Amino acid sequence: MARIFENLNHENKLKVKQALTQLIMPNVDSAEYRMAFSELGSELGILITEKYPDLGNVLLVCASEDADWLAKGLIDSLHHNIGLAVLWSNRITICQDPKIEVSEINKSYVDMEGDTCDTMIVVKSIISTSCVVKSQLNYLVKRVNPQKIIIAAPVMFVSAKESLMNEFPASVSSKFKFLTFAIDDVRDDKGVVLPGVGGMVYPKLGLGNQVEKNSYMPQIVRDRVFASSRA
């Protein structure tokens, strides 16, 4: 099956396809890679606003590597004062055949008004398996009790939605709304989705390997901490 596109229209089709193509270009530099994710984040934000105009109190959830580009692009396009949860995690393979991975959250930054939210938006560069998003949801859902959970990514693997739905009881999964622009169904022998987002995200963003990216403090977090200290 060739890549399937979703949620494209006259307004966003060219920009979204150009950004997705930029991600998979050979030897793309980190500045261009970051810019492509910023553009895709912006377009996801516009799409969310169009589909769900009544978001209420919002908490945006992302991994640390997605915060400054994909997540910030989404936040800036929402024109909405929203909370932010940034999670740092390690992805660990616990079995090779079949391949089973878990994601362990080792630190977090959560900035939100009040104890609960109406809408939780989980945004990720690519949803290949349920691993990372499952950990993020387990970490936060009971804490903030969202009424709606929007799971958004520029690219998803064909079975990602079903995998995530199966990881949670109906009381949680019934709240899920999935949004993407591209669905792929091919993996290489290492499990990397093709064409996906061009491979491993961390080094392409200029953040190094998994250990190095976990030492990166996103600028969006720095800005929020500084703003709260000045308030």
PLM features: what roles do these ranges have?
Residues M1-A231:
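PRPP-associated nucleotide enzymes
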